């Protein structure tokens, strides 16, 4: 089932804030009012996951400049996130919120729960300030994601939101031409 153009479902969970080195409660309301990235991954203390989360951290400053809040989510607890942050060279660099979802509520809400394993799949979602999913990417377990493409998608989503009636073509870059769908373009692209 696609979540595109659907509002995120309610949730409440415990999270770890690496910048403040503290635990706090987070909910779907935290994702509203600004752009958000929600990055699901299978498990802490694993193999591909730390490479993806470190790569996401490498784009964190760019995402912050775009006004984007970043959340990583796995079915581990917030306590395990803290332990992983304290012991992994890659994860110790992370500055964004790490949400624990041991109840699998959020993972189910975003339709990325591997029911057989009880773990999240590799899913990334861009959520607009209204709490509506604008983009989604879900990969097989052995395929890591590239956070630089995420920045590109967010810029396009933000542009389209700010410019109703325009769409961003393939390989669109900030400042390049967009399209205005209409009869005059039919068959001319």
UniProtKB/Swiss-Prot annotation:
Keywords of the record, alphabetical order, are:
Antioxidant, Cytoplasm, Disulfide bond, Oxidoreductase, Peroxidase, Redox-active center
Where are the active-site residues found? 49 (cysteine sulfenic acid (-soh) intermediate)
Q: Which domain of life is it from?
A: Bacteria
**What are the residue boundaries of the Thioredoxin domain, all occurrences included?**
2-159
GO molecular function (one): NADH-dependent peroxiredoxin activity
* Enzyme class, UniProt record, top EC level: oxidoreductase
Keyword Transport tagged: no
Catalysis: reaction(s): a hydroperoxide + NADH + H(+) = an alcohol + NAD(+) + H2O
* Transmembrane annotation, as ranges: none
Tell me, what is an example of a GO biological process annotation in this record? response to oxidative stress
Q: Where in the cell is it found?
A: Cytoplasm
Entry's EC annotation: 1.11.1.26
Subunit structure, interactors included: Homodimer; disulfide-linked, upon oxidation. 5 homodimers assemble to form a ring-like decamer.
Anything further noted? Answer: The active site is a conserved redox-active cysteine residue, the peroxidatic cysteine (C(P)), which makes the nucleophilic attack on the peroxide substrate. The peroxide oxidizes the C(P)-SH to cysteine sulfenic acid (C(P)-SOH), which then reacts with another cysteine residue, the resolving cysteine (C(R)), to form a disulfide bridge. The disulfide is subsequently reduced by an appropriate electron donor to complete the catalytic cycle. In this typical 2-Cys peroxiredoxin, C(R) is provided by the other dimeric subunit to form an intersubunit disulfide.
Family membership = Belongs to the peroxiredoxin family. AhpC/Prx1 subfamily.
* Function statement: Thiol-specific peroxidase that catalyzes the reduction of hydrogen peroxide and organic hydroperoxides to water and alcohols, respectively. Plays a role in cell protection against oxidative stress by detoxifying peroxides.
- UniProt name for this protein: Alkyl hydroperoxide reductase C
Q: What phylogenetic lineage does the species belong to? A: Bacteria, Bacillati, Bacillota, Bacilli, Bacillales
Encoding gene, per UniProt annotation: ahpC
